[in-house]
Amino acid sequence: MIDIIFHDKTGVTPYNPGQTGGFENAAGSGEIHYYRLFDGVGIMLLRLEMETYTEIRTQIGMIEINFCINGRFETSFSMRDSVLLKPGDMAVSCYDGRHGARSESRFPLGCYEGLCLEVDPAAAQNWLEKNAPGFSVDFAVLKQNLLGNRWFMFGTAGPRCEHVFRELYENAPYMDLRFLRLKVVELLMLLSRIPQEEGTDLYCSTEQTELAHHLRDHLLTNREGYVSLAQLAEEHGISVSHLQKMFKQVYGVP
């Protein structure tokens, strides 16, 4: 059972976070703590022990930023579009009403710790302009910097953003609202301005990820004797180094 705990000291209009819906009927255990920081912005701390879940998106224009603390987080939006996060990576999406309405997620290691930042750009910008005009964020610029003409991206968060993500994750349970608001605004400003590194999205393809799962299952169920990496690589027409790279990306070990 996944326990979903809401923490809201803002006193603003009640809000239903987007990502928690997929966990209500998921098989597994763990906790999701949702912290409402200000109108249009909330963060979720996820500590899960499970294999899979299905997420349904309905809120058009919502920006969702996931950061991996520990474990692996794999999401497939279609037969071709797949995301695989390892610690220090982030994934950004903005549901446009067409792409990513449904996604299938897996946790290859059976456990996951992460942070999800959900932003309603219009509500957040309105709140910032009224309450923190000196720290306003241009969400159109943020989306252009992160996504360009795409609806999702993924890759390394980079040292500056990773530091702030981890500060949020570690300090959210203390519920110091002023500190958490400051950190979220800092993160949004960084994401608006830091150029995305070349090589973003250059991770294992969906086919490679599925192959890694297949090979792992083969190794676990093979009862006929020892099979070397060289044999597996040859059988599937890839090099040993490429096979090791796939396992490293998906499971954290070569």
Regions inferred by a protein language model and the residue ranges of each:
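Short hydrophobic/aromatic patch on the recognition helix
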Residues: 242-243, 247
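Short, well-structured alpha-helical interface segments that form or flank functional binding sites
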Residues: 41, 60, 64, 175, ...
